[in-house]
Design a protein with these regions (language model features):
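Short, solvent-exposed helix-loop connector elements
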Residues: 239-240, 354-359, 461, 477-492, ...
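Non-catalytic, polymerase-adjacent accessory regions of viral genome-replication enzymes
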Residues: 1-201
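A conserved non-catalytic segment of reverse transcriptases
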Residues: 334-337, 341-342, 421-487, 499
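Extended C-terminal regions of large enzymes
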Residues: 524-526, 531-567
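Conserved polymerase palm-domain catalytic core
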Residues: 208-209, 213-228, 232, 266-435, ...
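A glycine-rich phosphate-binding loop feature that marks nucleotide/adenosyl-phosphate handling sites
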Residues: 394-397, 430-438, 496-497, 516-524, ...
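Amphipathic alpha-helical blocks
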Residues: 171, 185, 197-223
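Core structural elements
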Residues: 167-172, 221-227, 231-233, 340-341, ...
């Protein structure tokens, strides 16, 4: 049966824009702190594990069974309230979501499957966000739709014929395009993508050789190159980053093209990181909506070294719930267990470290696997708890919002759930907050109850946090400093515009007007002083370098000072 004629139980995110989050209603009851006081063929397995019939995935799909809204993995369709702990089989960022403001948000818009930094744009009508999806050809998009529809209509179907899709020339070509666009540092072999990007003949030969390696199953992942990045401006904490080779990044991107549509059908609606048509603004919409509904007690959870602690065996079990293709499973296992190579700065000697747990931060497929491992938690909290809390998650950063008095019990059960899956809460950062008394910070925003000046109604006030504002100012200072005065002013202002546009794109939401005005004033004054000293002027700091001159002659970007609630 043609994939276009398949009828599904729910509209497809790949065709009908499913998943676009609606904005919470503007007209709300007066709710506030005061009022709230009172090729291996194991067989296609469908449903309960019975043998299913063969499905050709590269152009057609089987007619799905009865439509089902149950998208949980490995759990009963009739979810029961949990008692002592959350039910469900629970097994299985590139950086933490607290660094979202550092993400690149300006650049050429694209489609695709694997997502580093979702900040802008709602995406295309077929459900793939411009920033979150690898730009794919029509035939590859058709494959993705087939996979998504099959997974959506049959929540317990296991896909057993996927490996052959990985070495299709169109899939590998799309994957290579993504790697070229993202650029990035070389892996342990020192090979970069510049040659492939400039020489079509070399590109075609390289892709053909890679496809042959995959087809003959002689491809083996290389070790990842371990580097360290500073997590803060003070340079007190470092994050280990594993950089795969270009070949490994291309194959991982191809795997993401094939696997993302399958798991996208299972992911919970309250998970927003590294997904099509999802972004931080929608996560904040859900937080605000929960607060307005009376869920003012919040478990502000922080996972300790999440990406480094994910156990391989449990994660592979989670993958196997949807994928029974042994070749794909072995490939994912090889990526997870690839050793890391670290070069000693003093001696220059290389040290090889085995990887017994965790998914390498820097791998293309790592965000997808990290989302998968916490998917059961999303469903357990939002659907299987009798208290009916709301959990909003962005990668390893999440909030559990509940009614007053329920937070302590939920935090205990959360701790027990995570320990059973060999994960840890950061006890120093995890806290239980009554938002009627103090605010919270989430995804770079601060949220606190405030009373309107005119309406006198209490509302959740959302604006960029002080930490996010400080990060922006530090970045602007790093560009407008004494060492850059010998550079052309237009080029320096262009760098400033890239920083401010990206930051504003991430935080142009909620009640950000006042903060945006302050940040614009800071950037203008900083640029004025830089220009004044560059040209050695003795007067006219403000009278000569006016706002109009900065915007007209030097092309300084003007901030948007009207921050409407965004969908």
């Amino acid at each position: 049966m043609s994939s276009e004629s398949t009828t599904t139980g729910e509209p497809s995110r790949f065709t009908d824009g499913e998943g676009c989050q609606d904005r919470p209603g503007q007209s709300r009851k007066d709710i506030g702190p005061k009022s709230l006081m009172s090729d291996q063929r194991t067989g296609g397995v469908s449903g309960g594990g019975g043998s299913g019939r063969v499905v050709r995935l590269s152009g057609e799909t089987c007619p799905g069974g009865s439509p089902s809204g149950d998208s949980t993995i490995g759990t009963s369709s009739a979810a029961k309230p949990c008692k002592a702990g959350w039910a469900g089989a629970g097994v299985g960022d590139l950086h933490s979501s607290v660094d979202l403001a550092d993400s690149k948000t300006v650049g050429e818009r694209r489609e695709g499957t694997c997502p580093p930094a979702p900040q802008r744009g709602e995406g295309l009508d077929d459900g793939r966000s411009d920033e979150l999806w690898i730009k794919t050809s029509p035939k590859v998009r058709k494959l993705q739709r087939v996979l998504y529809r099959k997974a959506k209509t049959e929540p317990h179907w296991r896909f057993y014929s996927l490996y052959g899709e990985l070495y299709r020339q169109d899939v590998l070509s799309d994957a290579l395009d993504q790697v070229i666009e993202n650029a990035g540092a070389p892996g342990v072999d020192g090979f970069t993508v510049e040659t492939l990007a400039k020489d079509p003949t070399a590109r075609a030969a390289w892709l053909h050789a890679l496809a042959e390696e995959l087809r003959t199953k002689t491809y083996r992942p290389s070790p990842v190159r371990r580097v360290y990045l500073w997590k803060d401006q003070a340079k007190t904490k470092r994050r280990a980053l594993g950089i795969p080779t270009v070949k490994d990044r291309v194959v991982q991107s191809a795997a993401a093209i094939v696997l993302q549509p399958i798991w996208e059908a299972d992911f919970h609606d309250h998970s927003y990181a590294y997904r099509p048509k999802r972004r931080t603004h929608q996560a904040m919409d859900k937080v605000r909506e929960a607060l307005l509904s009376g869920k003012v007690e919040v478990v502000d959870a922080d996972l300790s070294s999440y990406f480094d602690l994910i156990p391989h065996r449990q994660l592979l079990r989670q993958v196997a719930k949807r994928v029974s293709d042994g070749s794909v499973l072995r490939l994912i296992k090889a990526w997870l267990r690839a050793p890391s190579v670290e070069e000693d700065r003093d001696t220059g000697r290389r040290q090889v470290h085995p990887n017994r747990c965790g998914t390498p931060q820097g791998g293309v497929i790592s965000p997808l696997l990290a989302n998968l491992y916490l998917n059961d938690l999303d469903h357990a909290v939002n659907e299987q708890c009798e208290q009916k809390p709301t959990m909003v998650r962005y990668a390893d950063d999440f909030l559990i919002l509940c009614k007053p008095g329920q937070g302590a019990g939920l935090q205990t059960r959360l701790q027990r759930w995570l320990e059973a899956r060999k994960l840890k809460l950061n006890e120093a950062k995890t806290r239980l907050v009554d938002t009627r008394k103090e605010g919270i910070e989430f995804l770079g925003f601060s949220v606190a109850w405030r009373q309107g000046l005119k309406s006198q109604r209490w509302y959740p006030h959302v604006e960029p946090s002080a930490k996010s504002q400080a990060k922006l100012r530090d970045k602007v200072r790093a560009v407008l400093e004494v060492r850059t005065r010998n550079q052309a002013a237009v080029a320096v202002v262009r760098k400033v515009n890239q920083i401010t546009r990206g930051w504003a794109g991430a935080f142009h939401y909620g009640n950000s007007t006042h903060v945006f005005g302050q940040q614009q004033t800071f950037v203008r004054n900083r640029l004025r002083r830089w220009l004044w000293r560059k040209y050695s002027r003795t007067h006219g700091l403000f009278s000569f370098f006016t706002d109009d001159r900065l915007a007209g002659q030097y092309k300084l970007w003007n901030w948007p000072l009207t921050a409407a609630w965004q969908r």
